[in-house]
Regions:
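Post-Walker A helix-loop "phosphate-sensing" segment adjacent to the P-loop in P-loop NTPases
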Residues: 35-42
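ATP-dependent small-molecule kinase phosphotransfer cores
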Residues: 44-103
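Conserved phosphate-donor/acceptor-positioning beta-strand/loop module used by diverse small-molecule
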Residues: 96-99, 113-132
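Small-molecule kinase domains that catalyze NTP-dependent phosphoryl transfer to phosphate-bearing small molecules
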Residues: 131-176
């Protein structure tokens, strides 16, 4: 019986995914979208070390190793030599998931019945550098396998002010059914 309930849950799940390079504003967009609309922001597990200013359980759940079976994962990816994943059990109903492109492709292939709204957040390299992203991280991002912009339901170019970003997020919010 649990399996049937689980399948029904997956079929009715609504998920907003957000991808983009380091420093583009993915987490900021996720927070803005979650403020209204009843969406929870999923906290990915990761084996990477915590960065300065990050809070365990907010940006990520920091762990030493991954011991979750793959069939219990919503998505899994490796990036920069570290593992990132989210479990299916973390999703209650409507959720926002900040994920990389490989993870998004795998999610789309694994769960074809999930209602997805895919957002790409991007910013110029100079903007990202001004936000404190290192040149090494920018260079690493250049090695990512990018998805064509047409793959996404919405693209946010985050090169302006916080107020301009709020306006863009509001525009996207109207697109989410």
């Amino acid at each position: 019986m649990k399996d049937v309930a689980h399948l029904v849950f997956l079929y009715t799940m609504k998920l907003i995914t957000i991808t983009g390079p380091s420093g583009a504003g993915k987490d900021t967009v996720a927070r803005m979208l979650s403020e209204t609309g009843g969406y929870q922001v999923l906290c990915s597990y990761t084996t990477r070390p915590k960065r300065e200013g990050e809070i365990d359980g907010v940006e990520h759940c920091f762990v030493e190793s991954c011991n979750v079976p793959r069939d219990k994962m919503l998505a899994y990816t490796q990036y920069g030599g570290y593992e990132y994943w989210t479990t299916i059990d973390q999703v209650k109903d409507k959720a926002i998931y900040v994920i990389d492109e490989d993870g998004l492709k795998a999610l789309c292939e694994k769960f074809q019945d999930i209602e997805l709204f895919k957002i790409c957040v991007t910013a110029w390299e100079t903007t990202r550098l001004s936000r404190g992203v290192s040149q090494d991280r920018i260079d690493r991002d250049k090695q990512r396998k990018l998805l064509p912009l047409a793959f996404y339901d919405a693209v946010i170019f985050n090169n302006g002010t916080l107020s301009e970003l709020r306006d863009e997020v509001q525009r996207v919010r109207y697109m989410i059914v």
